[in-house]
Structures are given as C-alpha cells and as structure tokens.
Amino acid sequence: MGGLWDDLHIFAMDIMTIKSDRIHIYILNNTFMNKQAITLLFMLPVLTAGAQNPIIRGIYAADPTARVFNDKVYVYPSHDIMPPEGQRQDWFCMADYHVFSSENLTDWTDHGMIISQENVPWGNPEGYSMWAPDCVYKDGKYYFYFPDAPKEGRGFAIGVATADSPEGPFVCEPEPIKGVMGIDPCVLVDNDGQAYIYWSGMGIRGAKLKANMKELDGELTELRFPGNANAQAPNIPPILVGGQAMEGLPEGFKEGPFAFRRGDWYYLTFPWVRGDTSNGQNPTETLAYSMSRSPLGPWDFKGIIMAEHDNTCWTNHHSIVEYKGQWYIFYHRNDYSPSDDKRRSARVEKIAFNDDGTIQEVFQTKRGVGISQATSVLQPDRYSAASDDVSVAYVDTLDRFQGWQVSLPKPGSWLCYSDVDFSGVTKGNAMVRVKACADAEFSLREGSMNTGTVIARFKVKGGKDASKGEWMTLTAPLEYTPKGVTDLAITCELGAVDIDWVQF
C-alpha cells in the first residue's frame, strides 16, 4: 500500500491490540517525537495458521479443547503470555481466551478474544490464572467453562459464560460454580442430555450438572484442610466440595481430565506422571486413559495414549474429538519456546481405536494432519519423513513465530512432505525461499525421496548473495504437474541448501 503507509514507521513493540477488524497502534511521530494513539480501521481477515504442527501461529495456545459445532472444529485453548514485570515470573501466565475454528483442519481462523480476566465478575483482574477451558452446546446455548483465581480467598474456582454462538460474545455468570474448587474443567453432555463436569484439584473429580448447566446436582460436602488441625495453619477455613473422586485411576500426579463417549464406552483421559518423583527427578507428563460403562466410573485404567515429550516441556494437556469420521487428539508442547515450558503451542494428530475400544498409542509429528494446498505456502520443515542428516532451526531466533527452516546438508539428503493437493495449480512455475553459501542444486519431486517424477529443479549460483548466505526467492518452471493429492519430496543434488518455504 502506498500513501499513508509510506510515511509511517510502525514498530512491533508499539502495536497494542489486534482485534476483529480494528488495529490499535501507537505510532512514533518523527517530527514531534511523541506517541500518538490512532485506530486504523480496515476490513482485515482474521488471523489464520497453516496445516502443520503447531496449528496456531502468532500467539501461544496451550491446553487445546476441540469441539465440533456447526460442521466446524472449534478449538478453545488457554493463552500463555510472557509475565508482566513483577508478575508470576517463571510460572504459567494467562490473562484471556481466544477461540479458533477450521473446516478442514488445515486453515485455522482466530475469532479473537472471547473472555478476559478483567471482565470476570468474581475473578481477580490481575490473577493471570485463566488456565485450561472447555465449551459445550446444549439446548440452543454454548456454555464456556474456565478456571480463574477468585477475588476473595485462595486457589481456583471454575466459572461459566454463555453465548448464542460458539464464537461468542460470551457473558460471564456473576459467581463461579459452587462446590467446584480446582482447574481444568471438562463437560460431557451424554446422549440422554444429562451433563457431567470433571475437574482436577485434590485428584480428579466428577459430578452431575443440573439442567441449567451452571450448578452441581447433588449435596456439597465440607472439606477441612489438614492445616486446620495444625498450629502452622490454623486459620484455613473449610470448603464445600461437590461430586466424587474418580475411582480406578493409577497412582501418581494426574490433572487435566477430558471425558468423552464412543459407542457404549466412556473414556476418562488425563495427563499423568508415571515416573518416580521420590528421588528428586521431575519426569514429564504422559497422556493416559481409563474406560468405563458409566460416566462417573468406576474406571478401568488402560494405559498410555501419548508418551512423554522428547524435550523439556513438563506439561501436556489434550482433548479428543471425532470429525468427519476420523478421530483426532489435540495436545500441546513448547515448539516456539524451547527453553521455556510455560509458553506452549497447540498440536493435533490422528488417533485410532482397536476393536475392543482401547486406544492405539499416538506419536507426535511435525506434519500433523490435514491436506495442504500446493498454492499455499508450504513449510517443508514440518516434514513427514527425512534422511537422518536433515536438521531444523528457527528462521529468526528473536521472533520464533516466523517458524523454521530446514537444512539439506549434502547430496542425497531428502525430505518428504505428505498430503499436498495440486488440483488448484494453474501457474507454470514453482517458487522457493532458500539460502546457500555456495553452489547448490535441489529438486522437487512427486512421491518418494529420489525416485519420484521431477516437478521442478532449482539451482543456487555461488556469488555475492550465496556467499553471504542470504535468503532469496527463486522461481523455476514446472516440468510436471501432479494431479490431486500426493506427497512432495525435496532432494539435494549438489552442495547444501536451507529452505524456508515452497509454493506452486
């Protein structure tokens, strides 16, 4: 865009808010050297993310709860942020919630913020404790369940907000649910319309909800903390707790329950630390599950759905949903913050069941799920398979949301990026963003690593740009155009090359 934009210098640190169709920006006026607040109004597309893992780019999105509403998948994650100065340093810090949706599990739309800690009537407006949420539909209304730190007292409470649309606007109830003291709410609406709520806090608990979806159906029990009989903590008042502890779960730390029904089986899934913590070790969480013929158990522990992360991300948190005949598991890890496991990002994989209802183990991938359009920007660093010498690094370590680059270090190096739809390709060329420090050659092929039909060939000439290893965008004519959905392979044939993206 020309005109106004030619004269403005907009700094990333000066952007205050991006919401809906408005961008609120502070602009440094070079003439008067002061800050002026303006609002630029555009009909902007809402932010989207691509098909690969992580599925959300631009913000941290942990604890993803996926639900199917109106033939779309909606994801309700928590929103990790960097701690404000003096607040919750080196700990989880979350001040609001966003909601995302997709019709193809490839293109994700951010519908913006739906609830902030500042508009929860009973919550601490500076608590930064809006952890894992859930959202369900019943009788024409959408019910959003979320934990928060209360203004009065200690610990967590769980509140409810309602809306007429899965995207909001949501209106918070004036008080949290009585008898639910904890985090990680999950609500299961059974086939007969009865709703159940599960949460973690003093173990994993579950309870029936009343028809209004805002109250527990049952008596509350007075629970006294051990500190009441201890001179070190004599003033901790008892609390009223509803529901019941879930029986039949394994020993060890558990949180984040997610319950669902498939056929006649009920599943209670949860993050679980299966390692030994008694010797000072700090093993990370697995995702595990139990099964029952009843929504509140007793439960029969079955095992692991997903093993521990292969990095230092201590937590995992998930949801499981069926969409268009396929089951998926949504989870998180710290892809964009490798040295900080308090800033996490949502991922998704396919999940499968055995004939007896048990769940097959799921393995984490870069590629994730969904079909990528060849006409979109493809990120080969999210490959499905690769030779052992291929490596991945951030494009910009100061802005990790720019994603990754992949390095093919020598002739014979290869990678495969699965499920690319070429049906929309009308141009006669391919584009790549690459860098190399010397002459390099590589090809794009259909299918397997080095035996598939060549789609396009690229040559990077040594010289000024190559010797500096600077990024450049190259174009090459198509020698062949695949039909429909197929795999894309990239093979290195001379030298070494780094690739950021590919597009047809």
For the regions a language model picked out, list residue spans one by one.
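Carbohydrate-active catalytic/glycan-binding domains of CAZyme proteins
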Residues: 50-504
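Bacterial Sec-dependent N-terminal signal peptides
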Residues: 1, 5, 10-16, 21-52
